A protein has these predicted regions:
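Short-chain dehydrogenase/reductase
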Residues: 1-134
Length: 134
Protein backbone atom coordinates (compact mmCIF):
# COMPACT_ATOMS: atom_id res chain seq x y z
CA UNK A 1 0.00 0.00 0.00
CA UNK A 2 1.26 3.47 -0.81
CA UNK A 3 2.07 5.66 2.14
CA UNK A 4 0.05 8.71 1.19
CA UNK A 5 -2.28 10.94 3.16
CA UNK A 6 -5.39 12.06 1.30
CA UNK A 7 -7.27 13.18 4.39
CA UNK A 8 -9.61 16.02 3.47
CA UNK A 9 -9.46 15.22 -0.24
CA UNK A 10 -12.38 14.08 -2.39
CA UNK A 11 -12.06 11.62 -5.26
CA UNK A 12 -14.37 10.50 -8.05
CA UNK A 13 -13.73 7.03 -9.43
CA UNK A 14 -15.58 6.47 -12.70
CA UNK A 15 -16.30 2.83 -13.43
CA UNK A 16 -17.34 1.12 -10.21
CA UNK A 17 -20.28 -1.30 -10.43
CA UNK A 18 -19.19 -4.18 -8.22
CA UNK A 19 -16.25 -5.30 -6.10
CA UNK A 20 -14.36 -7.12 -8.84
CA UNK A 21 -12.68 -4.48 -10.93
CA UNK A 22 -9.77 -2.08 -10.78
CA UNK A 23 -12.16 0.77 -9.97
CA UNK A 24 -13.26 -0.84 -6.73
CA UNK A 25 -9.66 -1.60 -5.71
CA UNK A 26 -8.65 1.99 -6.46
CA UNK A 27 -11.64 3.25 -4.48
CA UNK A 28 -10.55 1.19 -1.48
CA UNK A 29 -6.96 2.43 -1.76
CA UNK A 30 -8.15 6.05 -1.86
CA UNK A 31 -10.36 5.48 1.18
CA UNK A 32 -7.48 3.73 3.00
CA UNK A 33 -5.43 6.89 2.35
CA UNK A 34 -8.17 9.01 3.95
CA UNK A 35 -10.00 10.39 0.91
CA UNK A 36 -13.75 10.77 0.68
CA UNK A 37 -14.77 8.79 -2.38
CA UNK A 38 -17.61 9.22 -4.84
CA UNK A 39 -18.12 6.77 -7.68
CA UNK A 40 -19.65 6.95 -11.12
CA UNK A 41 -21.54 3.84 -12.20
CA UNK A 42 -22.90 2.96 -15.64
CA UNK A 43 -26.68 3.46 -15.44
CA UNK A 44 -27.62 -0.08 -16.59
CA UNK A 45 -25.48 -1.50 -13.75
CA UNK A 46 -26.41 1.04 -11.09
CA UNK A 47 -29.57 -0.67 -9.82
CA UNK A 48 -27.75 -3.96 -9.37
CA UNK A 49 -24.85 -2.24 -7.59
CA UNK A 50 -27.22 -0.40 -5.25
CA UNK A 51 -29.05 -3.66 -4.49
CA UNK A 52 -25.80 -5.48 -3.72
CA UNK A 53 -24.82 -2.70 -1.33
CA UNK A 54 -28.24 -2.49 0.32
CA UNK A 55 -28.43 -6.26 0.86
CA UNK A 56 -24.93 -6.42 2.34
CA UNK A 57 -23.59 -8.66 -0.43
CA UNK A 58 -20.42 -6.55 -0.66
CA UNK A 59 -19.84 -6.09 3.07
CA UNK A 60 -16.76 -8.31 3.21
CA UNK A 61 -15.22 -6.45 0.27
CA UNK A 62 -16.01 -3.08 1.86
CA UNK A 63 -13.86 -3.82 4.93
CA UNK A 64 -10.83 -1.55 5.20
CA UNK A 65 -7.59 -2.57 6.87
CA UNK A 66 -8.27 -0.45 9.97
CA UNK A 67 -11.66 -2.07 10.55
CA UNK A 68 -13.71 0.73 9.03
CA UNK A 69 -16.21 0.04 6.27
CA UNK A 70 -15.70 1.71 2.90
CA UNK A 71 -18.52 4.19 2.43
CA UNK A 72 -19.23 5.91 -0.85
CA UNK A 73 -19.85 9.59 -0.27
CA UNK A 74 -22.07 9.59 -3.35
CA UNK A 75 -22.87 7.17 -6.15
CA UNK A 76 -23.63 8.89 -9.45
CA UNK A 77 -25.14 7.47 -12.61
CA UNK A 78 -22.44 8.06 -15.23
CA UNK A 79 -22.30 7.10 -18.89
CA UNK A 80 -19.06 8.60 -20.20
CA UNK A 81 -20.12 7.98 -23.80
CA UNK A 82 -22.04 11.25 -23.50
CA UNK A 83 -20.42 14.62 -22.79
CA UNK A 84 -23.86 16.19 -22.33
CA UNK A 85 -27.32 14.74 -21.84
CA UNK A 86 -28.27 16.07 -25.26
CA UNK A 87 -25.59 13.82 -26.77
CA UNK A 88 -27.47 10.74 -25.57
CA UNK A 89 -29.97 9.56 -28.19
CA UNK A 90 -33.61 9.70 -27.13
CA UNK A 91 -33.84 5.90 -27.35
CA UNK A 92 -31.07 5.65 -24.72
CA UNK A 93 -32.62 8.30 -22.46
CA UNK A 94 -35.98 6.48 -22.68
CA UNK A 95 -34.61 3.10 -21.55
CA UNK A 96 -35.84 2.13 -18.09
CA UNK A 97 -32.34 1.92 -16.64
CA UNK A 98 -31.58 5.48 -17.80
CA UNK A 99 -34.78 7.50 -17.67
CA UNK A 100 -35.01 8.01 -13.91
CA UNK A 101 -31.28 8.57 -13.35
CA UNK A 102 -31.18 12.29 -14.06
CA UNK A 103 -28.30 13.73 -16.07
CA UNK A 104 -25.93 10.79 -16.41
CA UNK A 105 -23.57 12.59 -18.80
CA UNK A 106 -20.07 13.77 -17.92
CA UNK A 107 -21.34 17.35 -17.73
CA UNK A 108 -24.28 16.24 -15.59
CA UNK A 109 -22.08 14.48 -13.04
CA UNK A 110 -19.70 17.47 -12.95
CA UNK A 111 -22.67 19.77 -12.30
CA UNK A 112 -24.02 17.46 -9.60
CA UNK A 113 -20.63 17.35 -7.88
CA UNK A 114 -20.54 21.18 -7.86
CA UNK A 115 -24.08 21.28 -6.49
CA UNK A 116 -23.36 18.67 -3.82
CA UNK A 117 -19.97 19.92 -2.67
CA UNK A 118 -19.22 23.31 -4.20
CA UNK A 119 -16.88 24.60 -6.87
CA UNK A 120 -13.37 23.16 -6.75
CA UNK A 121 -14.26 20.43 -4.28
CA UNK A 122 -12.92 17.53 -6.34
CA UNK A 123 -9.24 16.70 -5.90
CA UNK A 124 -8.80 13.34 -7.67
CA UNK A 125 -10.46 11.86 -10.76
CA UNK A 126 -9.87 8.23 -11.76
CA UNK A 127 -10.91 6.83 -15.15
CA UNK A 128 -11.57 3.15 -14.58
CA UNK A 129 -14.26 2.54 -17.17
CA UNK A 130 -13.98 -0.89 -18.70
CA UNK A 131 -15.42 0.08 -22.07
CA UNK A 132 -15.62 3.86 -21.92
CA UNK A 133 -13.91 6.50 -24.02
CA UNK A 134 -10.56 7.80 -22.82
Amino acid sequence: MLSIDLTGKRALVAGVADDGGFGFAITKALAEAGASVCVGTWPPALGIFETLLRRGKLDASLALSDGRKLEFERIYALDADFDTLEDAPEEVRAQKRYRDRGDFSIEGVANQLREDFGEGSLDVVVHSLANGPE
